[in-house]
Amino acid sequence: MFAFSKAPAGCSTYERVTQKFQDGSNKLRAAIEMDELTKQNGTINEKLQTAELYKQARQMLKEANEFNIMDIPESKRSEVREKREKTLNLEKSAQDRLIKICNEVDPNMKRASTAADPCRAARITPRNTRATVPGDKKVSKVKQTEKAPHVCSRGDRCGAHQPPPEKKSTPLKPVNQIRTRVKENKNPIGVQQQVFSFILSCCMRRNCRRPHYLFPCMISLKMNYFKFQATLPNQLNTVNRSNLLKGVDKAIGERLLDEILDSTGVRMDDVAGCHSAKATLEEAVILPALNPNLFSGLRQPVKGILLFGPPGNGKTLLAKAVAGESKQMFFNISASSLTSKWVGDSEKTIRGLFQIARNGQPSIIFIDEIDSILCERSEKDAEVSRRMKTEFLVQFDGATSSPDDRILVIGATNRPYELDDAVLRRFPKRIMLNLPDTEARKELITNTLKKHDMMDGLSSSDIRYIASNTSGFSNSDLVALCKEAAMVPVREIHRSKLSVTDGDKIRKIRASDFDTALRTIRPSTSDRILSKLSDFSRNFGC
């Protein structure tokens, strides 16, 4: 009915996106046509084929959105953005219809003929009478005519016709005796996904020779699988893109949506030390999500957290951990995200940022190096800079903001004493991430070496010795020290043998390698910076 072609390998990103969008639309149109034909009196097999078409259409439309907008020619970006918005709506419609079809099919339906003779229900479907799915290029080899006898692939479960008695096939094992290659898993959803994948591969492939009595089991698993997918607590999947951009200029909104971090792969356990900052972030982000009604009124979590301290002590890494563990919308904002060469665009961008955060709340806005944007106001400031700071303060906590807004702003800076007083007032939690102590240094060195499988040549006493000799080192200094120590065994290899040496044959790192590395890697934080940060923490810190 419809032809689904593949884009050429050497085509541009724009052509590939357009082709995938067209293929997904055609597949969805085929699914809708088959859905209309089978909505009233369709059989279970036909409805499952319709659901499979919807699933393929969703996958094609999802692939059409996997591109970088900067790879598209500037003259075509507006067209591609419109197609992306349309694609998201079509994908959502296909998902809703897919779940509805699974809900319509009763997995516990009793069939008298199957119960009376289970072997007859295990009849193999003849290849030349296989049902043709709309959009499939393969056509049945034998045309159905009025004189030809009707052969139904559903066997005795077909209410309109009976299978011819001369057609016989060897009965297969009942479904409860078939050995499925499913690994043991304590998670029931994981087991259902594996069983569903096995049955789907047996029943829905083109050269299917499996009996159709597997379909009732597949229906039950498919319903649970799609219901589980629909209830995943991912904030980005549950909020429609058009709802996020409500009340926001489209061009500015699309640029801000590119600043959203989906997943960073960093967890709280990856950050050594910083216990007070971890506890504060857990209290402000994770606990209110568990019981929002409890954290209301006077228990309402703070809306601003300022992380300050010497450079290289995990401020940005801690924000990445929050983005990785929380299911909230996370904006990673820098100075380049808010500034513009056009007059008035910076204020519009800030207003659009907070509007998108309100539309998708609960949400988190992380501003790295916040002192470059919100430093202390003075008479020497340019007019654009003053307007941008004023707009940020108004949107953060002004007349347009609401006390019920669940928006958390996290700022990170190495120079907190340069921030404006009004900015400090909007960050009630001001936490200093100081240089790691001995225990934190031991933990960081151990984690870094274990991550790269280089702990074999070192004992716990060696780690304790290294940590005691690295006083004043920041987290980034310790990582650089580990890298330098790992290079010491490599430097011992002669240059002529370096190209043919296997990495497994290099000797293990020893404590003496860290002594060698300490001669070149020195602390990067001066006493003057530490003194100024300590004074600020004593006067304004929490």
UniProtKB/Swiss-Prot annotation:
<keyword id="KW-0206">Cytoskeleton</keyword>
<dbReference type="GO" id="GO:0015630">
    <property type="term" value="C:microtubule cytoskeleton"/>
</dbReference>
<dbReference type="GO" id="GO:0005737">
    <property type="term" value="C:cytoplasm"/>
</dbReference>
<comment type="function">
    <text>Severs microtubules, probably in an ATP-dependent fashion.</text>
</comment>
<dbReference type="GO" id="GO:0008568">
    <property type="term" value="F:microtubule severing ATPase activity"/>
</dbReference>
<feature type="binding site">
    <location>
        <begin position="309"/>
        <end position="316"/>
    </location>
    <ligand>
        <name>ATP</name>
    </ligand>
</feature>
<dbReference type="InterPro" id="IPR050304">
    <property type="entry name" value="MT-severing_AAA_ATPase"/>
</dbReference>
<dbReference type="InterPro" id="IPR003959">
    <property type="entry name" value="ATPase_AAA_core"/>
</dbReference>
<dbReference type="GO" id="GO:0016887">
    <property type="term" value="F:ATP hydrolysis activity"/>
</dbReference>
<comment type="similarity">
    <text>Belongs to the AAA ATPase family. Spastin subfamily.</text>
</comment>
<feature type="region of interest" description="Disordered">
    <location>
        <begin position="131"/>
        <end position="177"/>
    </location>
</feature>
<keyword id="KW-0067">ATP-binding</keyword>
<keyword id="KW-0547">Nucleotide-binding</keyword>
<feature type="coiled-coil region">
    <location>
        <begin position="29"/>
        <end position="66"/>
    </location>
</feature>
<dbReference type="InterPro" id="IPR003593">
    <property type="entry name" value="AAA+_ATPase"/>
</dbReference>
<dbReference type="GO" id="GO:0005874">
    <property type="term" value="C:microtubule"/>
</dbReference>
<dbReference type="GO" id="GO:0005524">
    <property type="term" value="F:ATP binding"/>
</dbReference>
<keyword id="KW-0963">Cytoplasm</keyword>
<feature type="compositionally biased region" description="Basic and acidic residues">
    <location>
        <begin position="135"/>
        <end position="169"/>
    </location>
</feature>
<dbReference type="InterPro" id="IPR027417">
    <property type="entry name" value="P-loop_NTPase"/>
</dbReference>
<keyword id="KW-0493">Microtubule</keyword>
<dbReference type="GO" id="GO:0048471">
    <property type="term" value="C:perinuclear region of cytoplasm"/>
</dbReference>
<comment type="subunit">
    <text>Homohexamer. The homohexamer is stabilized by ATP-binding. The homohexamer may adopt a ring conformation through which microtubules pass prior to being severed. Interacts with microtubules.</text>
</comment>
<keyword id="KW-0175">Coiled coil</keyword>
<dbReference type="InterPro" id="IPR041569">
    <property type="entry name" value="AAA_lid_3"/>
</dbReference>
<dbReference type="InterPro" id="IPR003960">
    <property type="entry name" value="ATPase_AAA_CS"/>
</dbReference>
<keyword id="KW-0413">Isomerase</keyword>
<dbReference type="Pfam" id="PF17862">
    <property type="entry name" value="AAA_lid_3"/>
</dbReference>
<protein>
    <recommendedName>
        <fullName>Probable spastin homolog spas-1</fullName>
        <ecNumber>5.6.1.1</ecNumber>
    </recommendedName>
</protein>
<dbReference type="Pfam" id="PF00004">
    <property type="entry name" value="AAA"/>
</dbReference>
